[in-house]
Amino acid sequence: MNRHHLQDHFLEIDKKNCCVFRDDFIAKVLPPVLGLEFIFGLLGNGLALWIFCFHLKSWKSSRIFLFNLAVADFLLIICLPFVMDYYVRRSDWKFGDIPCRLVLFMFAMNRQGSIIFLTVVAVDRYFRVVHPHHALNKISNWTAAIISCLLWGITVGLTVHLLKKKLLIQNGTANVCISFSICHTFRWHEAMFLLEFFLPLGIILFCSARIIWSLRQRQMDRHAKIKRAITFIMVVAIVFVICFLPSVVVRIHIFWLLHTSGTQNCEVYRSVDLAFFITLSFTYMNSMLDPVVYYFSSPSFPNFFSTLINRCLQRKITGEPDNNRSTSVELTGDPNKTRGAPEALIANSGEPWSPSYLGPTSNNHSKKGHCHQEPASLEKQLGCCIE
């Protein structure tokens, strides 16, 4: 490898010598992968937001947090086409400096937002199961909305620095748009990239382990609804690890190489730089997989799809429009299917989707308001009126 070719990878960023690569492999492989993530993520999160906004008949704190998670994922997904175009052009940004800053800010903000709200969902379920009588389980929807706004404020505060400086850098004939680079320095931005993973990871693993242990101690893990709840908890942890761990591991390896080798020979970093951008696609995949979290969060979501599919099939068979039914598909949960399962785990599948639940004469509503009078067998062990 001649010296001239090695120098091609050097780029001065903020008066520091950095290594920057424009890899043909990324240009060929990542755009199709990101395209699939965009399609499935847009469909999944778009449908989730549609259900939240138009078919949810009442709100609870846990659903407010899930709604914010869906918003974060949706905002990240709509930025993917710009990144796809960037990779197709072999890391050559054609939209100018301000759009470059905005897209990188949106990616960083919504990546962090997804992490934060996944963590909040795990903590919320932890308190409802392990500490069912804790005051946090009784927070109002208004309080949950304020907490969500504060979390968004923290997220914006930690990523707004990406809007303040120029991130579009001339690299030969190409314009490179990057917020992460291989430089012999450890910046605050990169430190946060690691901290925002390991701290939530510890919290999510702790909450998941305590919930499963608590249920098994009370010999409740064999109940069908409890098994579904345990599946939900495990899905949250698995999605988090699969999507965010690979890029963090590669970034740590880059820091180690910088500490031991410096930036004198950029060829040392070619493979790890390629690995980092590939693992970043796993990060974007989080927005595609989070709808699985919504699906397992409550029987209401699969019930909704079952109801929608059944109505569509019925109309197709009869060949006539269903004029006697509302064009809005609403779920009416089956209380017989959910009786006896802890509310903290099944998220009240039988009530918020049904308009009758809101009626003053609803028996379900009456029992929920005075559940200490006739608690179900499993609710006695977990505590009632916890959601």
UniProtKB/Swiss-Prot annotation:
Q: Looking at the record, which segments are called Disordered? A: 319-343
Q: Name one GO molecular function term.
A: nicotinic acid receptor activity
Q: Which cysteines are joined by disulfide bonds?
A: 100-177
Question: Does Ribosomal protein count among this protein's keywords?
Answer: no
Name the domain of life this protein comes from. Answer: Eukaryota
Tissue localization of expression is: Expression largely restricted to adipose tissue and spleen.
Keyword Transmembrane helix attached: yes
List the membrane topology term(s).
Multi-pass membrane protein
Q: Which family does it belong to?
A: Belongs to the G-protein coupled receptor 1 family.
Annotated keywords: Cell membrane, Disulfide bond, G-protein coupled receptor, Membrane, Receptor, Transducer, Transmembrane, Transmembrane helix
Q: What is this protein called?
A: Hydroxycarboxylic acid receptor 3
- Topological domains (Extracellular): residue ranges? 1-28, 86-102, 164-194, 257-273
Subcellular location per the Swiss-Prot or TrEMBL entry: Cell membrane
Q: What does this protein do?
A: Receptor for 3-OH-octanoid acid mediates a negative feedback regulation of adipocyte lipolysis to counteract prolipolytic influences under conditions of physiological or pathological increases in beta-oxidation rates. Acts as a low affinity receptor for nicotinic acid. This pharmacological effect requires nicotinic acid doses that are much higher than those provided by a normal diet.
Check the record and name the InterPro entries matching this protein.
GPCR_Rhodpsn (IPR000276), GPCR_Rhodpsn_7TM (IPR017452), HCARs (IPR051893)
- An individual GO BP term: G protein-coupled receptor signaling pathway
**Ranges in the Cytoplasmic compartment?**
51-63, 124-142, 210-236, 299-387
Listed under GO cellular component are: cell junction; plasma membrane
Q: Which CDD domains match?
A: 7tmA_HCAR1-3 (cd15201)
Give TM regions. Answer: 29-50, 64-85, 103-123, 143-163, 195-209, 237-256, 274-298
Q: What is its main location?
A: membrane
Q: Extract the Pfam families matched here.
A: 7tm_1 (PF00001)
